[in-house]
Amino acid sequence: MKYYFLIVLIALFTFSCSTENKEIKPTVESVRQNLPPIPKSITLFGEKVSLEDEDIRERLDREIMANAYFHSQTILNMKRAARYFPVIEPILKEQNLPNDFKYLPIIESNLANVTSPAGAKGYWQFMPETGREYKLIIDDEVDERYNMSKATLAACNYLKNAKDSVGTWMLATAAYNRGIGGIKSDMKWQEATHYFDMDMNGETSRYLLRFIAIKLIMENPEKYGFDMKKIELYKPFQTESVSVAAPIENLALWAKERGINYKILVKYKLYLHLYN
């Protein structure tokens, strides 16, 4: 009996030592319970931004948790990003905008053609008057807010105009939510020129921090508990342009003659108001 007890103790001791000496690697499940620490700084729009202020860290912590633990929507955003970032990124580069702005339509619409309660539409969420101001066609037949390429170009022009007005890309991002006039007014009466030095309304005060949280998670998904090997990403749409010189009387027949159907035509031409 004594020998048996001694053997059990030796076995337990050996197991304990082997466990202590063995390096325990983080798993997806452990990461989900313990998110990585917030970095002391981040490169945003090509500039180093300090994240050491306690208030900023706590507010950013909230946005990281909100997105890291909202698995269904964050995974869906990753799937959609694989389809739409190849469209957005070349336009940003051509317009000399930082590549980070590809995350903005995730904040605005989760990369979906949606309509807000206020009436903003499309991936970049343009209101009708703002969309027309930035050269988007919006009428009874066409709504280019639903066209990713054209809406992205319009967003680039808005952001460049905003930066010229408020001075930095960070404030230009806030202006995309608050409006250029609203940010300029806040800057004036608060005598401030930096986003993190300003007291803003609830939505705008969270806007850039949500942007940073999305950037951190999308650029380091495994660190935040997303196993990219198991996520099936959406492929970019394969399309071709067809010139039309005259009105089309029967869209269903026109589509059929080109080897597709009306359903596919509607899917890829959401910015057209198609009627029977």
Predicted regions and their residues:
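LysM (lysin motif) carbohydrate-binding repeats in extracellular/periplasmic proteins that recognize
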Residues: 249-276
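Primarily a LysM-type cell-wall glycan-binding module
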Residues: 229-259
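An acidic, Gly/Ser/Thr/Pro-rich helix-cap/linker signature
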Residues: 1-96
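Short, functionally critical alpha-helical segments immediately adjacent to catalytic or ligand/cofactor-binding
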Residues: 97-114, 172-178, 265-269
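Catalytic cores of secreted or luminal carbohydrate-active enzymes
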Residues: 202-225
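Solvent-exposed, acidic/flexible segments
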Residues: 70, 74-85, 94-97, 101, ...
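Substrate-binding/active-site groove segments that recognize
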Residues: 119-140, 152-155, 159, 183-186
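Catalytic and binding regions of secreted/periplasmic enzymes and modules that target cell-wall glycans
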Residues: 159-186
